[in-house]
């Protein structure tokens, strides 16, 4: 839904797409396209590169090598790498890439949501992990919009958290 959201902006945003799927074999080939993608970034100079890891619908997790190369390239053009981690808590491998734990920095932002792992589908409750100057800019913009989900969804989520803590069903996500 990101292209639709961008279209509602100031009209100057353009969306560039770069596929990491071999469409003939329907195979995930992000690592094989790392160099090509980095060259694409340098050529087109996007302000934001948005990745999803793991992605939907394949559940593929981008490799550390791929993401590190993209971040290094984005830094060269003074852009931002944003990773949407909507499905991060649904990765059950014992070893995950280091970038799953990166703190935000001047060029890296992570988007988070509890709507997938917290049985809150459709509630759009989430947060951003970003440098302070990004958070401050977002607060300026958000100060004139609705800042939270509607009351019904807040109450439902509150009940879910309370019940899940009491019955221990939330523990698996916190370990």
Give the positions of each predicted feature.
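Short amphipathic alpha-helical segments and helix-helix/interface helices
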Residues: 3, 37-38, 67-71, 99-101, ...
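Conserved core segment of the aminotransferase class I/II
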Residues: 7-8, 104-175
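Short beta-strand->loop structural element characteristic of the AMP-binding/adenylate-forming
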Residues: 13-25
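A short acidic (Asp/Glu
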Residues: 3-5, 60-63, 91-96, 122, ...
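Active-site phosphate-binding strand-loop segment of PLP-dependent enzymes
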Residues: 22-93
